[in-house]
């Protein structure tokens, strides 16, 4: 499963991309507003940070004609742009039109298998089920992912399932186990995913042992101790 980051804050993208785990970025009008930046400028900067990565940029028009025009304009900003469209009749119409011109699309705000199938038939590159928001209704967001993926596999549908509305690391695990092709993850959740108390405890133990071996404080890195480290397993 690929990882996208769900943000329009360039510093967050830069930090997580340095880990070597990102395949793309998703944005939406709310995230762009929160960033306080010009939309086109942000997309260009993201493209430089994540070369080759998919960058979802959402249209704001509500009618098909407006979505198509805006989608073409946004797609022209950079070859990495994926035009993000709402899962509405107008959004499906725009998806079909943009796809026919070779423009990649991400149909978002998906909350059911029938909706996902419609997006796929309209030619969507990605369809984005909202895991967290489905959970909020009392249904199981990860089960929705599983059912969509099963339907796509059975129908030999190439549209990728992009798990969105990720709230915590367990949502990422659930999406992976349900067969999602991509999870778009907020910065905060990435920082939660990388941490585990046993990892830090193990590191502290290794460094304390190293300090004893070298007669140095635990803060002294091996490179400054002057001798070869003794490898301790377990």
Swiss-Prot record:
GO molecular function annotations of the record: aldehyde-lyase activity; transaldolase activity
UniProt-annotated stretches for the region Disordered: 212-234
Subcellular location: Cytoplasm
Pathway: Carbohydrate degradation; pentose phosphate pathway; D-glyceraldehyde 3-phosphate and beta-D-fructose 6-phosphate from D-ribose 5-phosphate and D-xylulose 5-phosphate (non-oxidative stage): step 2/3
Reactions performed catalytically: D-sedoheptulose 7-phosphate + D-glyceraldehyde 3-phosphate = D-erythrose 4-phosphate + beta-D-fructose 6-phosphate
Keyword field contains Transferase: yes
Active site: 84
Keywords of this entry: Cytoplasm, Pentose shunt, Schiff base, Transferase
Gene Ontology BP, a term: carbohydrate metabolic process
InterPro entries documented for this protein: Aldolase_TIM, TAL/FSA, Transaldolase_3B, Transaldolase_3B/F6P_aldolase, Transaldolase_AS, TSA/FSA_arc/bac
A GO CC annotation given for this chain: cytoplasm
Pfam families attached to this UniProt entry: TAL_FSA
Entry's EC annotation: 2.2.1.2
SUPFAM superfamilies: Aldolase
CDD domains: Transaldolase_FSA
Group of enzyme by EC: transferase
Family: Belongs to the transaldolase family. Type 3B subfamily.
Alphabetized NCBIfam families for the sequence: fsa_talC_mipB (TIGR00875)
Protein name (Swiss-Prot/TrEMBL): Probable transaldolase
Species: Deinococcus radiodurans (strain ATCC 13939 / DSM 20539 / JCM 16871 / CCUG 27074 / LMG 4051 / NBRC 15346 / NCIMB 9279 / VKM B-1422 / R1)
Gene name as annotated: tal
């Amino acid at each position: 499963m690929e990882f996208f980051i769900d943000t329009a804050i360039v510093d967050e993208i830069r930090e997580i991309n340095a880990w070597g785990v990102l395949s793309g970025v998703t944005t939406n009008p709310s995230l762009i507003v929160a960033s306080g930046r010009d939309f086109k400028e942000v997309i260009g900067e993201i493209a430089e940070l994540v070369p080759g990565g998919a960058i979802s940029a959402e249209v704001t028009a509500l009618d098909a004609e407006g979505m198509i025009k805006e989608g073409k304009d946004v797609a022209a900003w950079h070859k990495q742009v994926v035009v993000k469209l709402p899962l509405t009749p107008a959004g499906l119409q725009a998806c079909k039109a943009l796809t026919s011109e070779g423009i990649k699309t991400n149909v978002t705000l998906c909350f059911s298998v029938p909706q996902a199938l419609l997006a796929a038939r309209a030619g969507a590159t990605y369809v984005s089920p909202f895991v967290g928001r489905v959970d909020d209704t009392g249904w199981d967001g990860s089960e929705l992912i599983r059912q969509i993926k099963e339907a796509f596999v059975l129908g030999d549908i190439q549209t990728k399932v992009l798990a969105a509305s990720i709230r915590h690391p367990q949502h990422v695990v659930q999406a992976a186990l349900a067969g999602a092709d991509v999870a778009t993850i907020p910065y905060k959740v990435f920082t939660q995913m990388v941490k585990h108390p046993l990892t830090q405890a193990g590191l502290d133990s290794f460094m304390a042992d190293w300090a004893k071996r070298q007669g140095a404080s635990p803060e002294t890195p091996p490179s400054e101790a002057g001798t070869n480290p003794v490898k301790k397993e377990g």
